[in-house]
Amino acid sequence: MVKKLNLFISLILVIAVKGEDVETAVNKILPPGMQVQAIADSNIDGIKVVDIGELQPIYVTEDGKYFFYGELYSINESSINNLTDQAKRDKRADLIASNLSSADYITFPAKRAKHEITVFTDVDCGYCRKFHSEIEDYNEIGITVNYVAFPRSGPDSSSYNKIVGAWCSADPKKILTEQKKGEEPKISMCEDNPVMEHFMLGQKIGITGTPAIISKSGALFPGYLPASDLFSRLEASES
């Protein structure tokens, strides 16, 4: 969908739409199946932030005549802030909160949790295995890890079926751990599993590789990070 939208926008960026209300104007130029979800004021007078159901918003003039699709920055005395990145973080956090519950996760809790993360994982991913081999380090430092499934090879693949087996197990933590050690524990399949929903959610919020670590505030940390480094980044992102 993102590629489709990027291609579509590349064709119409130089075209101004007729003056009309923002929602009507934007809906007319969106690809089929997409529509405006929400409209909010931006930090710039006369510019609206428009949520079109993707992670990336678009920015539209109040009269609906012009828009741009890209990064919006604010310039302060001593820094430059990426306002679009903050909007993406907020959107990620909202999508995770509204689509996932505790029943969706395979959770490895910290005894004294200071941070809680959502980790999109694949049982056959090398760095996912490395991350999980250090799960006690993350828990010990105060990070609760909530795993969700993101089999990179997609539905009906070996990795997909393996991770479905973990979620269907009577002891998901045990099976997931064994799989990430390269073992092949006996698994059972079930229809009532959240793996496809996890996979589709990951695609919607822009996950392209694993492990993909997301903080409670929606900050994305792609790839493996040692416990101490991750903790430092979480502290900085939540401050």
Predicted regions, residues:
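Hydrophobic h-region of N-terminal signal peptides that target proteins for export
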Residues: 10-18
